[in-house]
C-alpha cells in the first residue's frame, strides 16, 4: 500500500527515505547483504540520518572492457549496462562510480567525471598523492587499491578507481564519502577540512545552481 500525505509518499504507513547519494560498482556483483552493509556504512560515514535518508549502491551491472573498444559494441550485457548508466547520468541521479581502470578510462574519455583538482583543491589532491588518477590531463579519479574500504566490502576489481560524476547534484556528499574512505590519512582529512576546500565546494555548488547544465 502506498499513501501520500501531500508532501511525501509513504509505504505501509512509513515515510520513504530520501536518497542522498547513489553509486555504481561495475563488474563486482555482490550479495545483497554485503551491498547493504556498504550502503549503511557510507551513510554513517557522510553523516546521513538512517531514519530518513539512504545511500544506494548498485553492484549488479557488468561490462566487457574489451567490448568498449568495439564499434558498434556487440556484447549485450555491456550495452545494457551502458544504457542504464547513461539514463542515471542524464537524470542527474548518479553521483559516483567505482570501476576497473579499463572501464574507468572509457568514461574518462567521455568527460564523465569531475576534475578533482577543481572540486577538491590542491591541498587534498597533494595529500592523496599518487592515488590521484589522471587521464588526458584531468584528475578524474582516485585509486582505491589496498584501501580498507575495498577489503571490507569485497571489492575485488583489479586496480579499482573511484570518480565523482560531473553531472552529480550531490557532489558535497560524494566528497564526504571520499573523506570517509581516506579518513585514516591525516593529511587528507586535514585538507578536506581546510578553508580552501570549503570555498571550492561553495563555488562549485553556486555555479551549478546558476547554470543548471552540469552534465
Which residue stretches match the model-derived regions?
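Solvent-exposed loop/turn segments at secondary-structure junctions
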Residues: 27-30, 102-106, 168-169
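Gram-positive cell-envelope targeting signals
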Residues: 1-26, 186, 192, 196, ...
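A bilobed periplasmic-binding-protein/Venus flytrap-type ligand-binding module shared by bacterial periplasmic
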Residues: 157-170, 189-191
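Extracytoplasmic/periplasmic/luminal assembly and interaction segments
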Residues: 29-94
